[in-house]
Amino acid sequence: MGVSKKPDLNDPVLRAKLAKGMGHNYYGEPAWPNDLLYIFPVVILGTIACNVGLAVLEPSMIGEPADPFATPLEILPEWYFFPVFQILRTVPNKLLGVLLMVSVPTGLLTVPFLENVNKFQNPFRRPVATTVFLIGTAVALWLGIGATLPIEKSLTLGLF
């Protein structure tokens, strides 16, 4: 490779071209038909071949065989339902538990109306939305981890 000359940004002709949007690189290899007809099918077929190869060479069992006469002590939902399961498990009144679950999306729907800012701004310039996101993530993790523990340790995560 040779030495490439850097553009002089003080040049008025170059500044005029950049102001008109002419500084972009529009040349190169076109996506049609090269990428869409040749490269993408190769990638897709390669991915399918890897999946089939792994399934044939390393077959994994789906799980242990079902025993209809043995029920586990505690039946847990899938991992993405852990926070909701924890709310329903710890709140004594079931109606209150359902209202708490409904209040989460309702509260999230009100966040955009609390801040009067442009939606394309930096997240750090939206303190209410950032705070709601961070606190909501922490609470969801806390509830999700607590759902995997026994009911006595679920709220304190066994720390206290």
From Swiss-Prot:
Record-linked InterPro entries: Cyt_b/b6_C, Cyt_b/b6_C_sf, Cyt_b6/f_cplx_suIV, Cytochrome_b_C_euk/bac
Domain of life assignment: Eukaryota
Spans through the membrane: 36-56, 95-115, 131-151
Biological process terms in GO annotation: photosynthetic electron transport chain
CDD domains linked: cytochrome_b_C
Membrane topology: Multi-pass membrane protein
Pfam families: Cytochrom_B_C
GO molecular function, one term: electron transporter, transferring electrons within cytochrome b6/f complex of photosystem II activity
Keyword annotations of the record: Chloroplast, Electron transport, Membrane, Photosynthesis, Plastid, Thylakoid, Transmembrane, Transmembrane helix, Transport
Primary location: plastid
Entry GO CC: chloroplast thylakoid membrane; plastid
Subcellular location: Plastid, Chloroplast thylakoid membrane
Subunit composition and interactions: The 4 large subunits of the cytochrome b6-f complex are cytochrome b6, subunit IV (17 kDa polypeptide, petD), cytochrome f and the Rieske protein, while the 4 small subunits are petG, petL, petM and petN. The complex functions as a dimer.
Function of the protein: Component of the cytochrome b6-f complex, which mediates electron transfer between photosystem II (PSII) and photosystem I (PSI), cyclic electron flow around PSI, and state transitions.
Family: Belongs to the cytochrome b family. PetD subfamily.
Name under which the protein is recorded: Cytochrome b6-f complex subunit 4
Organism: Oryza nivara (Indian wild rice)
Gene for this chain: petD
